[in-house]
Amino acid sequence: GLYYQHIKEMLAERFHMDIRYLEKLNQNKTFKAGEKIMVFNPGKSLQAPISRLVASKADNTLYAYNGKNLIATYPAVIGSTAIPSPTGSYTVKNQVKNPYYRATVVEGTVSKNYMLPPGPNNPVGVVWIGLDKANYGVQGTPVAKSYGKPATHGTLRLSNWDALEIYDNVNTNTTVEFK
């Protein structure tokens, strides 16, 4: 699989923080077994059904609703200028935890397909939530510092921990709106 590259990456993701922040909190630490370190307390995960997600391109934020009540917000990467996200309303079609990823590599006139294994460093992270619009969905990302910066192939990209939280609270009837 595409596992963590080192212990700091694993700890940062587990405690919902950027590696640089983990290092700043633990400047004189070596991150060896038995050593005490300081981490962020992410609190309890959301445990409420999400009936609607609204992706705001204006502020790079994903809003989660239960009925008319806003229950969570997430920083997100929503499309890019080269390949923008769609506009409109879609429905969750499928959900995959620890997905494989098909990559196509083109060299000259030769193109090869590769199937990349699951893991936190998979290009779609640890979650894929497919929409009823082909090739569009909600996904995790192995690059935590990229949220809020438009640089994706039209999908809605979140930190792996936020994508997992959404995965646990949506179903195939959940609406996803892009505005």
What residue spans do the PLM features occupy?
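Extracytoplasmic/secreted envelope proteins and their assembly/folding machinery
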Residues: K8-E9, I19, E23, D59, ...
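Extracytoplasmic
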Residues: H16-M17, K32-G34, A48-I50, K57-D59, ...
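Solvent-exposed loop/turn segments at secondary-structure junctions
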Residues: S45, D59-L62, S80-P84, V96-Y100, ...
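A structural motif detector for short, solvent-exposed N-terminal "entry" segments of globular domains
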Residues: N41-S80
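Extracellular LysM carbohydrate-binding repeats and other cell-envelope/extracellular binding modules
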Residues: Y21-L53
